[in-house]
């Protein structure tokens, strides 16, 4: 029981920051391209309390950890009205891409934090574990949210990029997206997308941080 509590404590901060950055980034991008819905709702903020969803931020992360040893979750849905964007079809891609890119940036920040902890000879294990969890959680959200299935960000990005007729047809999948995703997770098909994307994300942040790694070596 003590170990479970420690591990929950390790993942709590990274999960909270990850979903906060994801939601705030999408709200900011939407405002940048003409949709002020999220801004008007007070969602363009780094205050995590605003983005907490009882199910996605608390219940699901706890349940997934207890069942699998892994943590996954999401924030309260960000209010977006793509029709209010200056160029709805094109700008939707940028708004949806903002969330995963925010998670990649957070993964980089946690990675650099880990490097600095090692360089500072911090002996306490807890902050190192938190930094590792931060990288892991954000790479997972980065990879998962780029999966090309609506209403996930990646699905809406694909709709934005497809020709109009194909985009309209593919958008019809959205009402069934949740059930399709559950099936893909249950049959472990999603791992064939998520794991390679997480690896690519890890390579990207390692390359970006390589000058600092060299200086601290």
Give residue spans per PLM region.
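Hydrophobic transmembrane alpha-helices and their immediate loop junctions
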Residues: 1-217
